[in-house]
Amino acid sequence: MNKKNIKTTSSVSLDNVSIRYGNSVAVKNVFCDIEKNQVTSFIGPSGCGKSTVIRAINRMNDLIEGCKLSGSVIFEGIDIYAEDIDPVEVRRRIGMVFQQPNPFPKSIYENIAFGARVNGYKGNMDQLVEESLTKAAVWDECKDKLNESGYSLSGGQQQRLCIARTIAIEPDVILMDEPCSALDPLSTLKIEETIHELKKNFTIIIVTHNMQQANRVSDYTAFFNTEKKDKDLGGKIGFLVEFDKTKNMFNSPKQKSTQDYISGKFG
């Protein structure tokens, strides 16, 4: 990824980002600066574009036929959609943890080692595996069964294994798309505790429908909503309503729709 002459103090900046699928606009005109080593939550009702936006930050949407982005996504001063940028390298630097735990059909050890090996890691693999699992708060539960399948773990443990797998390739940013939605409350608490520790070393962006979770784990919050498209087209378009420090948004939101959403009046 070659440096461009784009100045930013943020880890990731979205500059007038709009995303469409074919002729249908999914989300429009998003401006937002994601601060380094902070947790930013994306909240909003279903269909508002928050998952579409988070997947644009590491070019996962490139894999969807007909998906087009306008505007700029700037990462560490680089326009990641510039022609000379390798999307594979973008995805290494900006990792993703998905909604459903998706360990590889390999041993716990190989779930960590495989990606690191593919990305050319030449260091002490045993140490990397231990450090990654420790940072994801799952080492104590895995250390005596590293050769067992990743599928042998509980759902919450599998999700922390997936976080450890992401950590092992040494990204700068970790994206989490509703990482706790399929988990029980105790497993959710473990993930949230892990997020608090991870922000010491990583910038984290999390999509969540859980307002209490957004309030607990994030430093900043972006609230997305929808508006109706042209009546002849049908459907809705997502847009960013408000972006602020989480404590400000939850205590004194600037927009009435933000207040209505976080208080449970719609969503």
UniProtKB/Swiss-Prot annotation:
This is Phosphate import ATP-binding protein PstB. Residues 12-251 form the ABC transporter domain. The keyword Cell membrane applies. InterPro entries: AAA+_ATPase (IPR003593), ABC_transporter-like_ATP-bd (IPR003439), ABC_transporter-like_CS (IPR017871), P-loop_NTPase (IPR027417), PstB-like (IPR005670). One of its GO terms (molecular function) is ATPase-coupled phosphate ion transmembrane transporter activity. It is found in: Cell inner membrane. The keyword Transport applies. Its main location: membrane. One of its GO terms (cellular component) is plasma membrane. It catalyses: phosphate(out) + ATP + H2O = ADP + 2 phosphate(in) + H(+). Pfam families: ABC_tran. Its EC number is 7.3.2.1. Belongs to the ABC transporter superfamily. Phosphate importer (TC 3.A.1.7) family. It is an enzyme of class 7 (translocase). It comes from Prochlorococcus marinus (strain NATL2A).
